């Protein structure tokens, strides 16, 4: 009867970050070369807002931090795969 919230949160944050990357991938790939665009900025903003609401309790914002880490990891992986395929 006991559920494992850690497993649920990690799979749900992975789903969120993959769907978030899909939403911003087109915008990122179509930007000009000199323009900086961080597809994970929404997750960064959410984690900062959480820290402002809960200044003394980082544990309350763990899911936001993990979602940002997952998004950033996926973004960098996609970026590496994209640059290695164009370099060939």
From Swiss-Prot:
PROSITE patterns, sorted: CHCH
Localization in the cell: Mitochondrion intermembrane space
UniProt biased composition (Low complexity): 9-20
Main location: mitochondrion
Disulfide linkage: 40-71, 50-61
One GO CC annotation: mitochondrion
Key words of the record: Disulfide bond, Mitochondrion, Transit peptide
Motif residue range(s): Cx9C motif 2: 61-71
Pfam families according to UniProt: CHCH (PF06747)
Domain CHCH: 37-79
Keyword set includes Mitochondrion: yes
Listed GO biological process terms: mitochondrial respiratory chain complex assembly
Database matches in PANTHER family: COILED-COIL-HELIX-COILED-COIL-HELIX DOMAIN-CONTAINING PROTEIN 7 (PTHR46811:SF1)
Family per similarity comment: Belongs to the COX23 family.
Full protein name: Cytochrome c oxidase-assembly factor cox23, mitochondrial
